[in-house]
Amino acid sequence: VHTQPILGVDRPLLELAAKSAGLSAEDIVAHELITADAQRGQVIGDLLAAGRLDNLTSVWASLEAMLAAKDDAEDILVLAAFNHEEVGSASTAGAGGPLLERVLAKVAAGFGDPAEIIANSIQVSADAAHAVHPNYPGKHDPTHHPLVNKGPVLKINANQRYASNAATETEWILACRAAGVPHQTFVGNNAVPCGSTIGPISATRLGLPTVDVGVPLLSMHSARELCGVDDIDYFVRALTAFYAAAQ
């Protein structure tokens, strides 16, 4: 159900936006306004409470891992952060668009046959995972209960909601072992359909073997989400080891 913004509609909201920009409401021709949590992130014991942990935990961890990975002239490390994942990815800035495959093809062309180079690559689809909520444990499969601060989550789905397969799962688990990082597995409850990620979309467009992984969160998609402090460090270390193994 769509509800009216707390400030009302039309003029009052536009006047507030115009005033903050030093304009008049008449100067605004069109707008894209998004509300956001104004509170700073807060560490509460062994938990981090903040907005947009889905999916900034993955973006930050991936960037840190790339910076930590050793340079290798034989390999090219790529980090792609897309928009519009929560609304289907069908946009020029989303994973359903052609941007990534075009960029990879152009970059690979400078090092040889693009098709061969891309065929020898592997992809991590990094997106937050649902940790078991203590009040609703029945929403999860009874044998797969990801917990906060117990390591990054490997996501598997027979209906291809996630792109992981036996080969890429093995690569991920070996990377976690090499990094000394605990890891968990999420398989959805058959009675509760799970969401998806851009993993299957990107894997389909690029033809790349892909593994779906992420940090477990509580209260995902709320204005303020919760994750384990240790899990962020675990995720960086696991991704760094994955990059190293791929080189």
State what each model feature region is.
Residues 1-247:
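N-terminal hydrophobic/helix-forming segments and targeting peptides
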